[in-house]
């Protein structure tokens, strides 16, 4: 039986940062994740994608952010149960929990922090004849894990959201040709991304086909071209890769059966205080939760994690007041015996 103060379900950025904030309060954490490595979507789906809204980083690659978070929490020695998913939960008489994974690993924790992002996820695939044939290195890619794979290649991207816009912009400097196809003239993405695509189109760096829709493929062993329906005209565009980016289908999995209050595939929480669910001792933070005014941003997940661990501290130490100290003043004592602190000022008289 694995013993811990906080059992975190999900090893994405929010789950990882929870370890740091909990460590400042001397709370131990253990993380369960269904993937074989920490990082969640950032590692599994787009490690090379730049993120622009992390404070202090004008730009940071998703994979690098995870690497930095893992380095940041190393001193607090979190445990990991990877390649396993949380399956069942039992609340004991003392208010603590036993969570058993799909492989039978048991975890005993005072509190549970569900930080599972979108839960388990799979891409929304377009309904096209023979698309399965072209999967598995034959030309159809649902994620961009390694942009270098597309260097000097002809790429057709289909979609109208942020991912389609962002990857069209990014790959325009790598691929020999980028064609962006969307069934509408209007895009549902960040305004600056839409304007950037317009700018790249004017510069001849991106071919834009709207309104248009990919309706078929050609190629005996791998994709050689895609057929695009534009109004009543069928156009054939040569390509090496077709990347349909229509979002992800989220699934909460077994967590949906834990008696939590669910709204539109997200877990309802009390955002007025501590992001606790309808079950005392179970919290939900990051993209997996919902409340009025919710924003699905990594930054917001960090904030939610910070407040959540304060609540867990009070739950474990009822009536004990925690005095907030700035890390620049107090320093950080790791569970591994290390200490980090600011350089001491030297007091010296001037004669």
Swiss-Prot record:
Q: Which UniProt keywords apply?
A: FAD, Flavoprotein, NADP, Oxidoreductase
Q: How is the cofactor bound?
A: Binds 1 FAD per subunit.
Q: What is this protein called?
A: Ferredoxin--NADP reductase
Report the InterPro entries cross-referenced here.
FAD/NAD-bd_sf (IPR036188), FAD/NAD-binding_dom (IPR023753), Fd--NADP_Rdtase_type_2 (IPR022890), Ferredoxin-NADP_redctase_2 (IPR050097)
Q: Write down the species.
A: Flavobacterium psychrophilum (strain ATCC 49511 / DSM 21280 / CIP 103535 / JIP02/86)
Organismal lineage: Bacteria, Pseudomonadati, Bacteroidota, Flavobacteriia, Flavobacteriales
According to the record's subunit comment, the protein's assembly and interactions are: Homodimer.
Q: Give the highest taxon in the source lineage.
A: Bacteria
Q: Which reaction does it catalyse?
A: 2 reduced [2Fe-2S]-[ferredoxin] + NADP(+) + H(+) = 2 oxidized [2Fe-2S]-[ferredoxin] + NADPH
Which cofactor(s) does the record list?
Answer: FAD
Q: A Pfam family in this protein? A: Pyr_redox_2
Q: Give me the residues that bind FAD, please.
A: 14, 33, 41, 46, 86, 121, 287, 328
Concerning its family, UniProt says: Belongs to the ferredoxin--NADP reductase type 2 family.
Q: Is NADP among the key words of this record?
A: yes
Q: What class of enzyme is it?
A: oxidoreductase
**Assigned EC number:** 1.18.1.2
Keyword Oxidoreductase belongs to the record = yes
A GO term for molecular function: NADP binding
